[in-house]
Amino acid sequence: MTVENAPQRETHAFQAEINQLLSLVINSLYSHKEIFLRELVSNASDALDKLRFRAITEPELLADEPALELRLIPDEAKGTLTIEDTGIGMSHDELVKNLGTIAHSGSREFIEALAQKGQQKDMQLIGQFGVGFYSAYLVADRVEVVSRAAGQGQSAWRWTSEAKGSFTVEPAERAARGTSITLHLKEDQKEFLGEWRLRSLITQYSDYVGHPIKLQVSKTTGTGDEAKTETSLEVVNKASALWQRSKSEITDEQYQEFYKHLTHDWEAPLAWTHFKADGNTQFTGLLFVPKQPPFDLDAQQQRGVRLFVKRVFIMDRCEELVPQWLRFVRGVIDSDDLPLNVSRELLQDSQVVRAIRKHVVKKSVDLLEKLAKDKPDDYLTFWKAFGTVLKEGLATEAEQKDKLGGLLRYESSREEGLTSLADYVGRMKEGQEAIYYVYGESRKAVADSPHLEALKQRGFEVLYMTDPVDEWAAQGLREFQGKPLVSALQADLKLQSTDEQKKEQEQHAEGLKTLTSKMKDVLQESVREVRVSDRLTDSPVCLVVPEGGSPAYLERLLQQRGRGAGMPRVKRILEVNPKHPVIEHLKAVHDRDPAAAQVAEWIELLHDQALLTEGSTIADPNRFARRMTGLLTQVAALAAAPAPAQTPASATAS
């Protein structure tokens, strides 16, 4: 298609989220305007990477322009700065889609939440969302993009906008594939036309970009009438992959800037590891642990670890290299042993990839262990951001479960704050044989649970597991440093008892045998068993989970998420406290008249109380309320009854 017979200029409205994002960018990042260059150079570098990858199987794409490079062209006379690449380019539809809409799911909710943060602005979140191209409006009041897509003939398109709610797209001319972004700089931003200003920014932010960045410079030779000004392009970056350099040559600042280039994050990473694997499988890796989670950590399009083969970019998110439970890790892997035309199918079946994956997992876990040991405060920052994701590894990565167990952090009954399992084991009481935990919705919900009464009485610390994934994590770990993990909600607490305590327990069980049998008959549709408890000291009853059963909170969670439809509800065990006044009174009433209506009423009332205590709902709230009202009425009547008259003899005695 030629310019003459192409459609005329089109005007499009920005997607609503784009308008909001532009406003956020312009008003939030005004003190960091220079980052526009890093963002645009990073995007241009991505376009070059994509072209180089396609050219492996389509070498004809390089025919009209073999060079893969970026160019910065300042024009002081026009007040413009052009960032140009010879990369993959964009078609008409891609220009409209990529520069006029946001493809992220949940984008509207994210931007609205971001806007509500006021002056705090959370720069790193804005960056993670992919400001990229729109950062140009920090320094420009008008932006023109001319692009020609590789392999789609000679059609080129011009996209233009002043960021006032709309943009235009029209036919244009461009000699070869690639994209040029021309910024019409604001009057107070002309500093970005200066050669040394541009050089310093490239050195600071983009020195490690793996393609040459050429800056157009002007030099004047001669004097007077013989003076002549010539322009030329000079390479201003090292144009070598940072991960291929020796660690001793790279500063912390360079690692941090490379991470920002790679991820578009605004904050430096918490930690990183740079390694080279030799032997049967040769590859280089550079992995980073971010400080904050991206808003779409679980989204399929989220970037993870980039795969390169012999310094050629292959793909952004190589799932085969990094397991799901390490999806927060960012970085690059560069292999010498994979073919350049590697496919997804080959990756899935490759022994090389399996070897790389194993090494990546080990290096990632080692990095977290080092962070936890050397910088515990930074590790807590990591844990609060990614702890839930890391726990998933306990259910899937058997080889790493001991190391992952050492990385867990939980609140506990001992103190505020988080504790490690190693510290917990170090504080265990004499005679304590297990690591105890309780699973529930929040610290507040579990701290006063009746299930903890016997443990607290013995001085045993209890871990509070309040994350939905914790139950699976605990089942995957099972033990730590030889100590089994035991849920306080389980039927068997593995409490050590003296012979005297065992004898007393047997006597209580025998004494309540007829009552517990009656309770089982009344509650046969609701509970598996009724038995005397050795865990209750203050509460009359509680429900415990039989072996193989799931806690009530987990059942509720699965139901809420629509995953519990086919899961049978496991009947729990009702435990009774033989020393509680309510149980003693119920036994007395039952012994006098097992068929008394009050017996069944109290049994059902106690069961409802146990359900409420564990956070479950009761089947008939109205009936429960009537029972409670009846019970309170009886108490009130007893309180209002006149005291029995004293006889003279009793009065004298008193």
Curated annotation (Swiss-Prot):
SMART domains per record: HATPase_c
Sequence segments annotated as region (A): 1-344
What SUPFAM superfamilies does this protein map onto?
ATPase domain of HSP90 chaperone/DNA topoisomerase II/histidine kinase, HSP90 C-terminal domain, Ribosomal protein S5 domain 2-like
Question: What is the name listed in the Swiss-Prot or TrEMBL entry for this protein?
Answer: Chaperone protein HtpG
InterPro entries in the cross-refs:
HATPase_C_sf, Heat_shock_protein_90_CS, HSP90_C, Hsp90_fam, Hsp90_N, Ribosomal_Su5_D2-typ_SF
Q: Which family does it belong to?
A: Belongs to the heat shock protein 90 family.
Its biological purpose: Molecular chaperone. Has ATPase activity.
Q: Name the residues that span the membrane.
A: none
Q: Which gene encodes it?
A: htpG
Q: What is its main location?
A: cytoplasm
Q: Enumerate the UniProt keywords alphabetically.
A: ATP-binding, Chaperone, Cytoplasm, Nucleotide-binding, Stress response
| Sequence segments annotated as region (B) | 345-556
Pfam families from the UniProt entry? HATPase_c_3, HSP90
